[in-house]
Amino acid sequence: MKKSPPPNPIIFYDIPSDKVGCWSPNTWKIRYALNYKGLPFRTEWVEYPDIEAKCKEIGAEPTGTRDDKPLYTFPVIQDPNTGRVVSDGPKIARYLDDAYPDTPKLFPPGTEEKQDAVFAELIQKGGPALRPLVIPPVVNILNGVSKPYFRTTREKMFGGKLEELVPQGEDRKAALEHMREAFEAFAKRLDEGGPFILGDKPNFADFIVGGFLQWFRVTLGEDSDLWQAVSVWGNGRLLKYLEDLRPYEGNPRA
C-alpha cells in the first residue's frame, strides 16, 4: 500500500528573482527533487544578504568557508516531520531518499557513482566556459536588496567587475564552442540511452543538469542569442530534455 505523504509541508529555502521566482541552479535541483518525490513543501524566499542570518536562526550548517569564515548557502530544507534541517544539495537529496524511502529514489542503488561521473564530465568540459557567460547577468534578475550583495561578493571572488568578466569577440566564440561541445556530448548520451541520464526515469543528476539549463534560460533570457544557441545544440535535444523534466517543475514562483 502506498503511504500517505508527510502531514506537514517541508520548508524549502530559496532565493527570489525580480521576475520568475526560482532561478538558481543550486535550488532548482532540490525543487525538482521534492516535486519528483511528491513531497509537499512550501517555499520561504530569502534575499542574499539575509541567508546567513536565516541559516543560523534555523540551525542550518554552513556549506563551506569564505575569507576563513563559515559560508552559508542555499538550498536548505527544514523538515517539521522529523525536526531535521539539512543544507547542501547532495546531502538534502540523500536525506530525502533516507527519510522517505517509499518515494521515487534520487539515487537508485548502484547509480550514485555513475551520476557523479556524468555530471563531472559535463562540468569539466563546459564549466569554465559557461561561468563568465552566465554568472554576470544574474545581477540583472535579482531584487534590489540582493543586487549589491551579489555584485560585491562575486567581483571579489573573480577579481574584477562583473561586466569585465564577460568574454567578447573571439574569446566569446571560443567559450560558446567549449559549451557547445560539452552539451552536445551530453545530448548524444541522452539520445543513446535516454530520455534521462540513466534511462527511463530521472535521477538527481538529471535535476542538477536541468537546474543549470533553467539558470541559463532565466538569466540569459529566452530571446538572447546565447539561449537561442543553446536551444539548437544537439538538434534541440536540450530543450526536449527540459520538456521531459517539466512534470517536476511545479510552480517556480510558489
Briefly describe each language-model feature range.
Residues 25, 29, 87, 91, ...:
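Short, well-structured alpha-helical interface segments that form or flank functional binding sites
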Residues 118-233:
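GST-like fold's C-terminal all-alpha helical module
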Residues 234-242:
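Intrinsically disordered, low-complexity polar regions and short flexible loop motifs
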